[in-house]
From Swiss-Prot:
GO BP term, pick one: translation
Similarity comment: Belongs to the universal ribosomal protein uS11 family.
Domain of life: Bacteria
The protein's name: Small ribosomal subunit protein uS11
Keywords from the named record: Ribonucleoprotein, Ribosomal protein, RNA-binding, rRNA-binding
Oligomeric and partner information: Part of the 30S ribosomal subunit. Interacts with proteins S7 and S18. Binds to IF-3.
Pfam (any one): Ribosomal_S11
GO MF annotations, alphabetized: rRNA binding; structural constituent of ribosome
Cystine bridges: none
């Protein structure tokens, strides 16, 4: 029986100058994905992937760190300008946008794409603390 050699696919360095930054900010975590204009992911980072655990994932600082990491990885592919799509009600929305700008990406547009139901699913029950 012939043994297969373990060949891993090398990450190809694309040269993309404009893209879209998708910021998904929930009450528990913040995920930043940077894609090209067609929606193919170039770089991503989340508060959880950077080592934040538990309630620290939902902080604005964790969102800032996730946005910086994603911006740094996308700038290695030649990214210069981004449109920002923000989704969700979380605490890290503004912090992530500021971090993208501070990392050196030029922001051309900011859109709020939070899905709003036309009285769809029943929401979760209110918390009694």
């Amino acid at each position: 029986m012939a043994r297969r050699t373990n060949t891993r696919k090398r990450r190809v360095r694309k040269n993309i100058d404009t893209g879209i930054a998708h910021i998904r900010s929930t009450f528990n975590n913040t995920i930043v994905t940077i894609t090209d204009v067609h929606g193919n992911a170039i770089a991503w980072a989340s508060a959880g992937s950077l080592g934040f655990k538990g309630s620290r994932k939902s902080t604005p600082f964790a969102a800032q760190m996730a946005a910086e990491a994603a911006a740094k990885a996308s700038m290695e592919h030649g990214m210069k300008t981004v449109e920002v799509n923000v989704k969700g009600p979380g605490a890290g929305r503004e912090a992530a946008i500021r971090a993208l700008q501070a990392a050196g990406l030029e922001i051309t547009a900011i859109k709020d794409v939070t899905p709003i139901p036309h009285n769809g699913c029943r929401p979760p029950k209110r918390r009694r603390v």
